[in-house]
Amino acid sequence: MSTSDSIVSSQTKQSSWRKSDTTWTLGLFGTAIGAGVLFFPIRAGFGGLIPILLMLVLAYPIAFYCHRALARLCLSGSNPSGNITETVEEHFGKTGGVVITFLYFFAICPLLWIYGVTITNTFMTFWENQLGFAPLNRGFVALFLLLLMAFVIWFGKDLMVKVMSYLVWPFIASLVLISLSLIPYWNSAVIDQVDLGSLSLTGHDGILITVWLGISIMVFSFNFSPIVSSFVVSKREEYEKDFGRDFTERKCSQIISRASMLMVAVVMFFAFSCLFTLSPANMAEAKAQNIPVLSYLANHFASMTGTKTTFAITLEYAASIIALVAIFKSFFGHYLGTLEGLNGLILKFGYKGDKTKVSLGKLNTLSMIFIMGSTWVVAYANPNILDLIEAMGAPIIASLLCLLPMYAIRKAPSLAKYRGRLDNVFVTVIGLLTILNIVYKLF
């Protein structure tokens, strides 16, 4: 073998799939699987079998193409170690940096409000239905839970970071186990309700409207955008110097594709298992009760007549506990991002970016008071969680995940090679449909 052949062979071996690629595949997958997944079966199953089958077809393209677009934006910066804020500033100046900071903050903060409502409702339904205690005052419950989480965050942040990272995989395993365990309870109710003669494409309960609203919850549930910037920086530092940027882009796309496949497989199996165990009418009731699907499953098994199996009794309690842990995990992770974003905004606009004018402790205190105070107000008001996701959470995520990369591809010279592609049209349409949910909710 010649020297040149040896070099090519060595480079091919080094550039093949690495352990770090597997680690990042699982990391992206684990980031997306959180409390938001607990609401996807409700929205997906609300319209019955045909809409959820259409969502199954759309799930992977939405997850893959949208996150790949964001990764390409992150890859387009001249500095391999530059994050998304630096890249946007490079393309669009300081104004672009301010816009991305606002987008990141407002993409995460509404999620905290959603989780504040969710954890309050989940705890209250567990307290009343599984433990059998008298109802508590909602304002007191929300305040107690938020103060408890604030205490843990304030005094044990480093420990909680480790604990939450360890909880990702047990939570995913729990979802898969519950999905499998529900199989003996599957029934044909969702199939029996399919009447092809009475199906409507349009109208409030039509297939198109149901799938349109389902796109929002998919954007929300299949979302690992907060970690994409760190992921791209890591891969650029690992591959770009030796193999070039085009190779790094293909490697990032490959990792995102595999993570998306895993994510869609787990979430859609969980959604179908819930739908075949319950029914579209049950999903509508869960939406009206404003609780995640695991809490509804717990209540469903609690209300079963006759002799209950050991599994049914176990699931009745385990489902609510798993839901509470999942929501706390998601709340904590999003709190850290919101805190960092709000600290940056306060520093930028309140102190003109001068870090010497205010201590980190004071910044954290001011931000915590605003975050926890606003979350308590929303949790006490108890807006419908799915409506909140569709009207606030998902549209802001779509702005960051879909429309910002498409705008950059249109305007930035370093992204010109991606112009004119069909997948760009798909990502743009998904982003616009998600944002238009705001208009639909107003009328």
Curated annotation (Swiss-Prot):
It comes from the Bacteria. GO terms for molecular function: L-serine transmembrane transporter activity; symporter activity; threonine efflux transmembrane transporter activity. GO terms for cellular component: plasma membrane. Keywords: Amino-acid transport, Cell inner membrane, Cell membrane, Membrane, Symport, Transmembrane, Transmembrane helix, Transport. It is a multi-pass membrane protein. InterPro entries: Amino_acid_transport_2, Hydroxy_aa_transpt, Thr/Ser_transpt_TdcC. It catalyses: L-threonine(in) + H(+)(in) = L-threonine(out) + H(+)(out); L-serine(in) + H(+)(in) = L-serine(out) + H(+)(out). The keyword Calcium does not apply. Its main location: membrane. It holds the Pfam family Trp_Tyr_perm. It is found in: Cell inner membrane. The chain crosses the membrane at residues 22-42, 44-64, 97-117, 140-160, 163-183, 207-227, 261-281, 311-331, 366-386, 389-409, 423-443. NCBIfam families: PRK13629.1 (NF010152), stp (TIGR00814). Belongs to the amino acid/polyamine transporter 2 family. SdaC/TdcC subfamily. Involved in the import of threonine and serine into the cell, with the concomitant import of a proton (symport system). This is Threonine/serine transporter TdcC.
